[in-house]
Amino acid sequence: MLYYDEINNGNLNLEDPYILEGHHFEEGGPLYEYYGPGDVIDLRTLLADMIQFSDNTAAHVLYQSYGGWTTYRRDALQYASHDVDDHFFEPQNYLTSQYTNDLLVYLYQFQDEYELLLNDMANSFPTEYLNETMPYSTFQKHGNYNIYYSSIGLVLDDNPYAISVLTSLGTRGKIHIGQINQLVNEYIN
């Protein structure tokens, strides 16, 4: 959300170029497959790929360009209403459902400022993860790394809610994410 704020404040433009460097590349996502070191890619593509495909290369470029991991994470705390522990700053991308729900509640409260982000979340695997068994569309950001499959999202239909499902169940976790969202949806509605 930091980059979307910078765009909204006029400090950045979606067309701004970023140079991909060798140390940015991580497996998974389209950037790793279709671009190489030295290629130039615009901010819009980086943001879209990071959200829609959970592209780690795009995320790496963005947090490095923001001032590095620690600066990026420190500034991201502005969206949290709860304290985080020291693990939050470790490079393993440690997250808790409390922190991710804080992000989602903030996003819900300021939806008009994050239309582009919500659009990308709507296009993130619309039939998988939180959306796998849902009667409504969930605006989601998913991720998977080793045995960790996770997804966070907003359901804006009927009775809106935020949901964060973080698993360590391998590929089984991906299936359970959608089932949990469906159960929550049935309970709320």
Segments from the language model and where they lie:
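Short glycine/serine- and small hydrophobic-enriched flexible loop segments
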Residues: 1-9, 64, 102-109, 182-186
